[in-house]
A protein has these predicted regions:
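NAD(P)H dinucleotide-binding glycine-rich loop of Rossmann-like/cofactor-binding domains
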Residues: 94-177, 181
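Residue-level marker of beta-strand positions
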Residues: 65, 83-84, 99, 128, ...
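Glycine-rich beta-strand-centered segment in the early N-terminal region that forms part
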Residues: 22-36, 51-98, 140-142
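Residues in the short beta-alpha loop(s) of Rossmann-like NAD(P)-binding domains
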Residues: 205-209, 265, 295
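Mid-domain Rossmann-like dinucleotide-binding core that forms the NAD(H)/NADP(H) cofactor-binding site
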Residues: 143-227
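C-terminal hydrophobic helical "lid"/dimerization subdomain
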Residues: 247, 297-347
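Glycine-rich cofactor phosphate-binding loops and adjacent beta1-alpha1 units
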Residues: 165-177, 214-287
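C-terminal substrate-binding/catalytic core of Rossmann-like NAD(P)-dependent dehydrogenases/reductases
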Residues: 269-319
C-alpha cells in the first residue's frame, strides 16, 4: 500500500512510498483511510526538527489527523464495517505514570508516551491503518469528510474542559466574554465551542483578507485586528503561539480571568516584560494562566459531539483545500488563504 513517510531528523525526506500492510499488532480494527489533515507539527517533522521513527525502523509514516471507514473489526469490539472513525493520537507510557494509568495520557508525567505519526508509532497517512478499539472514535455519519477536523477539535475540547474546571474554583463564576487569538483551525474551533457554550466571542487575527473574517462573522463572533478593540474578556484561548501576542494578552482578562495557552512557541527570542507589574495584576485579580496540549478519549468524544452539533457549511469553510493523494506534495506547500489543508485518500 502507499503511505506518506519521512526519515525523522532528515529535512525534506517526505515521500509517497510503498509499505507493507499494517500488522495486526497495530490494532484489531482495520480502517481504510479517507482523509488526512495537515498541520504545523507535520511540517516540523518534514523539516527534520521533530519526530521519531518506530524502534528499529528508519522511516515514520506521517499523519495524526485521521479520518477513515472501518474495513474489518472483530465481533463485540464496538465497531463494524462502514463506521466513520478517527484514530486517537497519543498512547500511554508503558510504566505507566499515574496520569496514564488513569486514562489521562494527555497529562503524561514521565514523557514516555508514544504518538501516531509523531513519536515512535507509525501514523495514519497510509491507505489502510489498524487501531486498537480503545483508541478509535466513532463519528456521526452525517459529518462525512468534515470528520477530519476531530483531532484539532479534541485539543480545543480539552482546553475548554480545563477552563471550566479552573473556573469552578469560584462558586459564582459566570463568564460572559471569550477572546480567541488566532483564526486558524484550532482558533476557529475554539470559537465554535465558545459559541456553543453561550459566550460572547471575539477572535483576534493578523489577517483580515481571505475566508477567516467571514467564518468568524458567520459564527456570530466578532473579528478583530487589534487587541485594543476587544472588550475585557473573562476567558482567553491563545492559539497562535506568537510571543508578542502572548505578552499582549497576559493580564488583559477580567477579574478571576483565565488564560489558556494552546499554541506552541519557538524559543530563542527575548521580549521585555514588567514581571512585577504582571505579578501584581495577576495576584490582585485572581488570574490564572495555564498550558494545554493533546487530548484523551473523553476530549475526542466531546469534540465529536461539538462537531455533530455544528453547522456543516461552516465547518466546510475551515477546510480550504482538499488535495488528492496523487498530488500530495501540493498539500505541504502553504498558500496564502490556507486554513486547513487535507490530503484526500478517497479521490
Amino acid at each position: 500500500m502507499h503511505a506518506l513517510t519521512v526519515r525523522p531528523g532528515t529535512p525534506n525526506s517526505i515521500d509517497l512510498t510503498t509499505v507493507p500492510e499494517p500488522p495486526p499488532s497495530d490494532g484489531a480494527v482495520l480502517v481504510r483511510a479517507l482523509a488526512l489533515g495537515v498541520c504545523g507539527t507535520d511540517r516540523e517533522i518534514i523539516a527534520g526538527q521533530y519526530g521519531w521513527a518506530p524502534p528499529g525502523e528508519e522511516r515514520l509514516i506521517l499523519g495524526h489527523e485521521s479520518l477513515g471507514r472501518v474495513e474489518d473489526a472483530p465481533d463485540g469490539c464496538g465497531f463494524a464495517k462502514g463506521d466513520l472513525v478517527a484514530g486517537i493520537v497519543r498512547r500511554p507510557d508503558p510504566v505507566p505514570c499515574p496520569a496514564c494509568a488513569a486514562g489521562a495520557w494527555d497529562m503524561c508525567r514521565n514523557g514516555r508516551y508514544t504518538e501516531r505519526g509523531i513519536k515512535e508509532r507509525n501514523g495514519y497517512g497510509s491507505e489502510f491503518f489498524r487501531v486498537e478499539p480503545d483508541f478509535l472514535i466513532k463519528l456521526d455519519p452525517a459529518l462525512g469528510p468534515l470528520g477530519v477536523l476531530i483531532e484539532p477539535a479534541s485539543v480545543v475540547a480539552k482546553a475548554w474542559q480545563h477552563v471550566r474546571r479552573i473556573g469552578g474554583r469560584a462558586p459564582a463564576w459566570t463568564p460572559r466574554v471569550a477572546l480567541v487569538t488566532g483564526a486558524g483551525p484550532v482558533g476557529l474551533l475554539a470559537a465554535l465551542m465558545a459559541k456553543q457554550m453561550g459566550l460572547v466571542v471575539h477572535v483576534l487575527d493578523h489577517n483580515d483578507t481571505g475566508p477567516k473574517p467571514k467564518l468568524v462573522a458567520a459564527l456570530g463572533a466578532t473579528f478583530h485586528l487589534a487587541l485594543d478593540d476587544v472588550p475585557c474578556p473573562d476567558i482567553v484561548i491563545e492559539c497562535t503561539g506568537a510571543p508578542s501576542v502572548i505578552l499582549d494578552v497576559l493580564g488583559r482578562s477580567a477579574p478571576d480571568g483565565i488564560l489558556c495557552l494552546a499554541g506552541v512557541s519557538s524559543g530563542g527570542r527575548q521580549f521585555p516584560l514588567d514581571v512585577g507589574g504582571l505579578n501584581r495584576n495577576m495576584v490582585l485579580e485572581n488570574h490564572v494562566v495555564f498550558g494545554s496540549v493533546n487530548a484523551n478519549r473523553a476530549h475526542y468524544a466531546a469534540a465529536a459531539e461539538a462537531l455533530a452539533r455544528a453547522d456543516r457549511d461552516w465547518l466546510a469553510g475551515i477546510i480550504t483545500r482538499r488535495v488528492p493523494l496523487a498530488r500530495w506534495r501540493e498539500a505541504f506547500e502553504p498558500q496564502e488563504d490556507d486554513i486547513k489543508v487535507v490530503v484526500d485518500f478517497a479521490a
